[in-house]
Amino acid sequence: MSVKWEKQEGNVGKLTFDIEQEKVKEGLDRAFVKVRKTLNVPGFRKGKVPRQIFNQRFGEEALYQDALDILLPEVYSQAIDEAGIDPVDTPQVNIESMEKGETWVLTAEVTVKPEVKLGDYKGLEVEKRETELTTEELEAELKQLQERQAELVVKEDAPAENGDTVILDFEGFKDGVAFEGGQAENHSLELGSGQFIPGFEEKLVGLKAGDEADIELTFPEEYHAEDLAGQPVVFKVKLHEIKTKEVPALDDELAKDIDEEVETLDELKEKISKRLQEAKEESVAQAKQEEVIAKAVENAEVDIPHAMVHHEADHLMNHFAQDLQAQGLTPELYYQFTGQTEEAMHAQMETDAEKRVKMNLVLEAIAEAENIEPTEEAIDEEISTLAEKYGMEKDAVRAALGDMSELKSDLKIRKAIDVLLDSAVEK
């Protein structure tokens, strides 16, 4: 096989390769076997026409396209290996020469993985974050748990305050006319929750059960309903009932209500402290990793082909559709509810995709610069982890992973991240 790679502008180049006569003959033979199965020729049973008769009747050229379809995956793969290039998309292959009895010559305009010019990636400064759980953090968590056990009790002859829950009727009017979506009866609203437009909840503070009021407001300029955005309106409201939170005492009894596995408040505090400490350490480690990766990526230079970004955006769109499906929705319903289009969503995904692509390219380049190669022990350990996670036999996991290229790439990237973290300087 003759292969020629001509680098052009950016990440694109022209790949010229051929299929030698002997290989062409093999492809034609395989194509004839495929075509003959469905061929009807008078005087012969279906699928039994001899090759010579086929050539006389249709010409050998009738097999060329099928032969090319059969041979192309193999010869293209061989050509890119010999050229030493790493394509990032499937190119359009053009036929330069396809003469009977001669070598076939093909060309393809190929977009390849870009070269990464690494900047500083070792000894990067990162923020020193506190990992020790504070008393304030523990108390805040206990307070949240305490408030979750609170009960709402009716407030008798007392004005509504922030934090109270009111039961009310309301109807909104613009220029004296009720507008769509502005009416409800016996609606439950926690004051201070920010569920309504600015000013609505604040003007309910101080009212008592049985009170009626007209609340004058202006919708925010960025409100989603264009006919109401920035417009003055009046809400007629009537309060039926006010409820306040009755928070239980933080004691042993409450501790047992919160967690049936503990007997005392001290036991609950110890259990929560351990959980919060682990979560904080994990959060700090994640923040450090994200910061050091972001700095290494920022310091690197790379011209990312749009094909890579588009492919990654497609991948993100597929994940998005799967997440919606898990919630019982479809992309079509989501677009209908939100007023967004698939094209706009894909464009939004491309922004995230470009960041992800650059990050992966930089981490791969760091792995290469550090001569990182996963050991057989590391590969076997990862396979064991996957087998346990998905309840599969190790051999089944190996079979599913195929040539292990994706697994090896993941392990390389993890090791590259370790290089960044191990050399990072906390300040």
Curated annotation (Swiss-Prot):
Keywords: Cell cycle, Cell division, Chaperone, Cytoplasm, Isomerase, Rotamase
Record-level Gene Ontology MF annotations: peptidyl-prolyl cis-trans isomerase activity; protein folding chaperone; ribosome binding
Plastid among keywords: no
An annotated GO BP: chaperone-mediated protein folding
Catalytic activity from the UniProt record: [protein]-peptidylproline (omega=180) = [protein]-peptidylproline (omega=0)
Family per record: Belongs to the FKBP-type PPIase family. Tig subfamily.
HAMAP family tied to this protein: Trigger_factor_Tig
Protein's name according to its UniProt entry: Trigger factor
Organism, scientific name: Listeria welshimeri serovar 6b (strain ATCC 35897 / DSM 20650 / CCUG 15529 / CIP 8149 / NCTC 11857 / SLCC 5334 / V8)
